[in-house]
From Swiss-Prot:
Sorted UniProt keywords: Activator, DNA-binding, Gluconeogenesis, Metal-binding, Nucleus, Transcription, Transcription regulation, Zinc
GO cellular component: nucleus
Start-end of Gly residues biased regions: 657-669
Positions with biased composition (Polar residues): 21-41, 50-60, 195-217, 230-244, 292-322, 334-351, 557-576
Family per similarity comment: Belongs to the ERT1/acuK family.
UniProt source species: Ajellomyces capsulatus (strain NAm1 / WU24) (Darling's disease fungus)
UniProt record, GO biological process: cellular response to starvation; gluconeogenesis
Protein name per Swiss-Prot or TrEMBL: Transcription activator of gluconeogenesis HCAG_03671
Length: 776
């Protein structure tokens, strides 16, 4: 046998008897190679007879341009890959059929790429639709192969056994539910043992890791049956089912069938990379957040509930089985434990015990993407996962049942697909909704510029009243260094420019408000004059300052100024003389105008922090536009005169009792006295710890009875925690109650804070954004 014959070249065997005898011996020794060597020759000879062309022996070789060429397959089978021959996309391929190896024809294993070394072998399977045996291709292949005569019987056997022999036969035993269901389909019922099989029993889902999903062997191929036909009670529907279009993993959340991924059309060499690419695209498109068109929904842009998997995909469905694989409640009509389906708490595959076991005694576990609806979102550590999840399941099951009943009444065989806009009205809340305010309202509402001149005048007057002459001079020097720059940048601006500047400020503030609401860090935003323009809820909890007070919508009754230095005027006496701060909703600086005044940033910091801030602000205002400052400061707690009186009374009650119990008893007496006086409404819901005053600022002569502010200060949360000797550890600071106790002894909260300056289109400092974190 010549070398060309061994390599499968189309050169016909020589006519010499000796060569024929030698070839016959080789064929007897290796019949597979003999059939291979004859197949190209027969194929070439057939082509020559049909085209009516005659070729010489020199032209009938592999380099012949007229030789019909095979289309290169995306992945060769194992036999063709080992022989380095051209294979086809069909399974079994033509070469294996001619060699009689159709039973062992399967995809070859490629060498892993470096970035896939950590991927399991089961995840590197090729595309599902590409590798399943196509009936139409099988019919065409059978018609083209009938000319070969002896190969027709092998083709018939290959068509019958292709589904069972595509993967290893040993792995087919993992899915016991299908074998049991197949044996009972002819009888029209399914025994209860099928429903209690371990392959679909929720008790088999051990959840080894927070992000784990039910373990299904992707390397196995179940029998050619449909899930819906296996679970139905009519044998007629089971006989009409076609081949399963979704392969083996019916319950695997990472399976591409759950998202309508067409892996074969992605031109990936392996399933692992294609699935990762498709999942990233599914996440990036935000399915369920933005309502796409119905046509896009039918193509695969489905929402979180995966509602487009209807009975049209899975065959006929009876009234006892809704036409959804993964509905809003996860598989709520599967009842593996055999219990009654009237209890909505037990109608899902993740029953109450499973959910409680996964999320009960540990931190809230995460779930794989799209493995469950948004009802499985991780709750807070202080909530009860069992109660939260089950309440959400009750609501979801009720709505799902009503929708399923309506679909069965209209058309149980072809229910209409549920579009993503319809899912948004099912009661699924995804995060906090964006406020309905439109940016267009900002441009329509701003009609006049903001008076920064009066703001700086008010700031100067406040600094002169609060600080000593030496500290006032330090702040004045810092502001004087940037005053020429402000004058130079604003002297060319007209009225329209100033209005546009205010519109830019309001529009930027509109964006920052969303950021503040989404971020859990205590944050404030103020103008370049230091006036507070926006504040987060966490800042109010930390310092006790209400948002309405900071923004100038309510009177500012704070008397806590830190008390670290004597004031410039000797005493902090307001101009109106009635004990009300000038910035308490009255006219600015005691003058006319009737404009409410927001709180200045200097009112929130102690003396040293204010001086340090303005020195840094002078360097950063017209310096580095992307720069920021990170340092420490002391925030002043909000305290009124009534809070000071309540704290003073608590200290007097403390002195009469033992050290170990005096603090708690005194605090309790204050709480009782304050509670009998009025309700805690003055200082807001987030500022219930306002009895955290500095003892240096406490006026012993002031014996006014506690008002509503003192009631808030000595409420039930903090009535027994007013002892100045009490210390707080890291474990004691938890929730709003713990944050309110920070700085309750001296009225100061030591914080680390970072702030930056944002400029407008005229390169003028527009606003200051500050983030605080308490030092515990």
């Amino acid at each position: 046998m010549t070398a060309s014959t061994q390599n499968g070249s189309p050169t016909p065997p020589p006519a010499a008897p000796t060569a024929t005898n030698q070839e016959s011996k080789n064929m007897t020794a290796n019949p597979a190679d003999a059939s291979e060597s004859q197949s190209p020759a027969n194929e070439k000879g057939g082509g020559t007879a049909e085209n009516g062309q005659k070729h010489t022996s020199t032209a009938a070789n592999a380099k012949d341009p007229l030789r019909p060429r095979r289309k290169k397959a995306k992945r060769a089978c194992f036999a063709c890959q080992r022989a380095h021959l051209t294979c086809g996309d069909e399974r079994p391929c033509q070469r294996c059929i001619k060699r009689g190896l159709q039973d062992a024809c399967h995809d070859g294993v490629r060498k892993k790429a470096k970035y896939l070394h950590d991927a399991p072998n089961e995840a590197l399977m090729p595309g599902i639709r590409r590798n399943f045996y196509n009936q139409a291709n099988a019919t065409r292949t059978n018609a083209s192969q009938q000319q070969n005569g002896p190969n027709s019987n092998s083709n018939k056997d290959s068509r019958q056994n292709v589904a069972a022999n595509f993967y290893s036969p040993q792995s087919a035993s993992n899915f016991d539910v299908y074998t049991q269901a197949k044996s009972q389909q002819g009888q029209g019922h399914i025994p209860p043992t099928v429903m209690q099989d371990t392959s679909i029993n929720p008790s088999a889902f051990q959840a080894p890791s927070p992000t784990s999903t039910p373990n299904f062997d992707l390397s196995s191929n179940p029998p050619n049956r449909n899930l819906s036909s296996a679970m139905t009670q009519t044998p007629s529907s089971a006989s009409n089912q076609t081949q399963d279009p979704f392969g083996a993993a019916f319950f695997d959340p990472s399976h591409p069938a759950l998202f309508n991924f067409d892996i074969a059309s992605m031109n990936f060499g392996n399933r692992y990379g294609a699935l990762e690419f498709g999942m990233l695209g599914h996440m990036a498109t935000g399915a369920g957040d933005t309502p796409p068109s119905d046509s896009a929904t039918q193509r695969g842009s489905i929402g979180r509930s995966s509602g487009t998997f209807t009975a049209q995909n899975f065959g006929d469905s009876t009234n006892t089985q809704p036409p959804f694989l993964f509905g809003d409640p996860v598989l709520n009509d599967w009842n593996p434990s055999g219990q009654s389906q009237t209890n909505p708490r037990n109608n899902n595959i993740y029953n109450q015990n499973t959910v409680a076991g996964q999320m009960g005694e540990q931190h809230p576990n995460a779930f794989a993407i799209e493995s469950a609806p948004m009802n499985f979102a991780s709750p807070g550590s202080t909530e009860s996962p069992q109660m939260t999840t089950m309440n959400q399941f009750d609501e979801a099951n009720a709505k799902f049942s009503s929708r399923t009943a309506l679909m069965h009444q209209t058309n149980p065989h072809q229910p209409p697909p549920i579009s993503t806009p319809g899912l948004k009205h099912q009661g699924f809340q995804v995060g906090v909704k964006r406020r309905y305010r439109s940016p267009s309202s900002i441009y329509e509402s701003v009609k006049e510029p903001y008076s920064y001149t009066s703001g700086f005048h008010n700031l100067t007057a406040f600094i002169q009243r609060r600080f000593s002459p030496q500290k006032t001079l330090q702040i004045a020097k810092a502001l004087a260094s940037i005053r020429p720059s402000f004058i130079a940048t604003t002297k060319t601006l007209n009225q329209d420019d100033l209005i546009f500047m205010e519109k830019c400020f309001q529009r930027t503030l509109w964006e920052y408000e969303d950021f503040i609401n989404a971020c859990g860090t205590p944050t404030i935003v103020c103008r370049r004059t230091g006036e507070i323009a926006a504040v987060g809820k966490e800042f109010s909890i930390l310092t006790g300052w209400k948002k309405e007070v900071l923004l100038g919508k309510e009177p500012n009754l704070n008397v806590n100024t830190g008390g670290s230095s004597p004031r410039g005027s000797g005493t902090f006496t307001p101009r109106n003389g009635n004990g009300v701060d000038p910035h308490s909703g009255m006219s600015a600086s005691g003058g006319g105008g009737g404009r409410t005044q927001p709180v200045f940033l200097a009112e929130l910091l102690d003396d040293d922090s204010v001086i340090e801030f303005y020195e840094d602000f002078a360097k950063l205002a017209f310096g580095d536009s992307r720069g920021s400052v990170m340092t420490t400061c002391k925030l002043l707690k909000y305290k009124t005169k009534e809070d000071s009186a309540a704290l003073f009374q608590g200290r007097e009650a403390q002195q009469g009792g033992p050290d170990g119990k005096g603090g708690g008893g005194g605090g309790g007496d204050v709480a009782t006295t304050a509670a009998t006086t009025s309700t805690s409404t003055s200082n807001g819901a987030n500022s219930s710890g306002h009895a955290n005053a500095n003892r240096n600022n406490t006026n012993p002569n002031n014996s006014s009875p506690p008002s509503s502010s003192s009631a808030a200060a000595a409420g039930p949360l903090h009535g027994a925690q007013l002892s100045p000797k009490q210390t707080w550890g890291k474990r004691g600071i938890a929730g709003e109650a713990g944050m309110n106790q920070l700085g309750f002894r001296d009225g100061k909260v030591e914080c680390s804070y970072c702030w930056t300056v944002k400029r407008d289109v005229f390169d003028i400092p527009m606003l200051i954004v500050m983030n605080f974190l308490p030092c515990i």
